[in-house]
A protein has these predicted regions:
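Conserved AMP-binding/adenylate-forming
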Residues: 1-79, 88-91, 104-110
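Short glycine/proline-enriched turns and hinge-like loops at secondary-structure junctions
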Residues: 29-33, 86, 132-133, 179
Length: 193
């Protein structure tokens, strides 16, 4: 029996339970199906101090067990290995479909690199009256938008994952540690669209 698998974060520690559930209904999903990661065990907090509202956002009771709602999208394989796919906070809902913003970035990066683009790429979503949300990509260098769109069409990229707007910005918003500031990035995109 293997003790690790490439791409997996491993198996839960002894005494820890992990479930993959539908993010809206919290119904448990089958092996290898992607969904919300729930964690239970003695290490899970009882709640936020003096903040029942915040506690109710991240803790649910199911089958007599308190589960922490991680916000991560993942899957469990047949051997109990957990693979994390993305964060649900980094997802967009377009016409009822959940789209990973990280996957959008991975999709457009080769198209941009093919055009000689070496800058940062950050995908986000903004509200859309027709589809619920629409995809926006922020970039911090000049690029040939038509060439990138043509590349994605030729590659037969899923049309749902193709950004509707490409916006060049002076700089991508970042936190003090250098990581992308996703809330500021989303706000900036909404202001510029």
């Amino acid at each position: 029996k293997t003790s690790n698998k490439i791409g997996s974060v491993g198996q839960p520690l002894a005494g820890t339970s992990v479930r993959i559930v539908d993010p809206e209904t919290y119904e448990e999903l089958e092996t290898n199906e992607q969904g919300m990661v729930l964690v239970a065990g003695p290490q899970v907090m009882a709640g936020y101090l003096n903040n029942a509202e915040k506690s109710a956002e991240v803790l649910i009771e199911k089958d007599g067990i308190t589960w922490y709602v991680s916000g991560d999208k993942g899957k469990l394989d047949e051997d109990g290995f957990l693979t994390l796919i993305d964060r649900y906070s980094r997802m967009a809902k377009l016409g009822g479909e959940m789209i990973s913003l990280g996957a959008v970035e991975q999709l457009v990066r080769p198209a941009l690199i093919d055009q000689g683009y070496l800058g940062d790429i950050v995908a986000t979503s903004v509200e859309d009256k027709r589809k619920g949300e629409r995809l926006i990509v922020l970039l911090d260098e000049a690029f040939d938008q038509k060439a990138v769109i043509d590349y994605l069409k030729k590659a037969k990229a899923n049309s749902l994952m193709r950004p509707s707007s490409w916006i060049q910005v002076e700089e991508i918003p970042r936190l003090g540690a250098g990581k992308v500031d996703f809330p500021r990035e989303k706000k900036l995109a909404a202001e510029l669209v």
